[in-house]
């Protein structure tokens, strides 16, 4: 896909991977609408993007709500006149033992990470189909490929998003709309700020800019998937497929330290 002139909606576009991708797309000539729940962050993101010459608008909206999604889609029509690319990037996470996580926290992850992308894709499809060359980019997680302990709900919703994208891609094959699924590994973003797990338990972080560059490449190639994490992550994915008990044993050996590191992880 040639990105120049494309109209792109990025949810969760005021920070992290979303903002980094907005910068990368702007350099390719895309027109942008970025969303986020916090108006101050959205305004700051828009100012930073416009300072580089980007054609960008922002809207403060909670895509986990019906009203927030309606506001977002109305803004896409008002500011961009339609859509060529929908990037479902907004995310929420709460780590810890399942019985210690509150029901409202579980529901928030389900609503933000799974329900919102499905509903936004549904709402955007008429616009994407009208252009005859649209794309949906769903930001899942490498945890959808190898489910980590103490992330049961987050792993479930991210795996659900990946399966949603796979099914929808096949449904839309031949209809002019492509679906790309992105699987970031650990990324240095505000969402990861409360995760204290380190390299001793296998956590390492790459920059949001590196992930954004990979997403940009995936969009241009109309790739099916972008998987981050390098050879070590791919080896873990392969092992999890071929010998899941070996992965069970590996996590058991670091379970106490792993739990201590990820237990504070919360971004809702």
What is each model feature region?
Residues 14-16, 38:
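Conserved glycine-rich cofactor-binding loop
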Residues 28-45:
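Conserved glycine-rich Rossmann-like NAD(P)H-binding loop of the short-chain dehydrogenase/reductase
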Residues 39, 60-73, 103:
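The beta1-alpha1 cofactor-binding region of Rossmann-like NAD(H)/NADP(H)-dependent oxidoreductases
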Residues 97-98, 102-110:
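Substrate-binding pocket helix/loop in short-chain dehydrogenase/reductase
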Residues 121, 157:
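Active-site helix of classical SDR
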Residues 141:
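Residue(s) in the substrate-gating loop at a strand-loop-helix junction
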Residues 181, 197-235:
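C-terminal helical subdomain
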């Amino acid at each position: 896909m040639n990105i120049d002139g494309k109209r792109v909606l990025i949810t969760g576009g005021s920070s992290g991977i979303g903002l980094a991708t907005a910068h990368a797309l702007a350099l390719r000539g895309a027109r942008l609408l970025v969303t986020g729940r916090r108006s101050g962050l959205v305004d700051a993101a828009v100012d930073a993007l416009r300072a580089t010459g980007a054609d960008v608008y922002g809207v403060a909206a909670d895509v986990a709500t019906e009203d927030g999604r309606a506001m977002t889609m109305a803004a896409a029509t008002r500011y961009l006149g339609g859509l060529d690319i929908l990037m479902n990037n907004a995310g929420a996470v709460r780590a810890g033992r399942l019985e210690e996580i509150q029901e409202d926290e579980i529901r928030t992850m389900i609503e933000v990470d799974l329900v919102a992308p499905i509903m936004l894709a549904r709402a955007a499809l008429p616009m994407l189909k009208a252009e005859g060359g649209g794309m949906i980019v769903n930001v899942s997680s490498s945890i959808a490929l190898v489910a980590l302990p103490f992330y049961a709900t987050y792993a479930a919703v991210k795996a659900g998003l990946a399966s949603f994208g796979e099914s929808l891609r096949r449904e839309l094959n031949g209809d002019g709309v492509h679906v790309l699924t992105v699987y970031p590994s650990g990324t240095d973003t505000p969402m990861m700020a409360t995760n204290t797990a380190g390299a001793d338990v296998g956590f390492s972080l790459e920059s949001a800019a590196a992930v954004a560059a990979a997403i940009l490449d995936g969009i241009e190639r109309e790739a099916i998937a972008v998987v981050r994490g390098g050879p070590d992550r791919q080896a873990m994915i392969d092992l999890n497929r071929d010998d899941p008990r070996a992965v069970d044993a590996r996590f058991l050996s670091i379970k106490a330290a792993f739990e201590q590191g990820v237990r504070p992880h919360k971004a809702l």
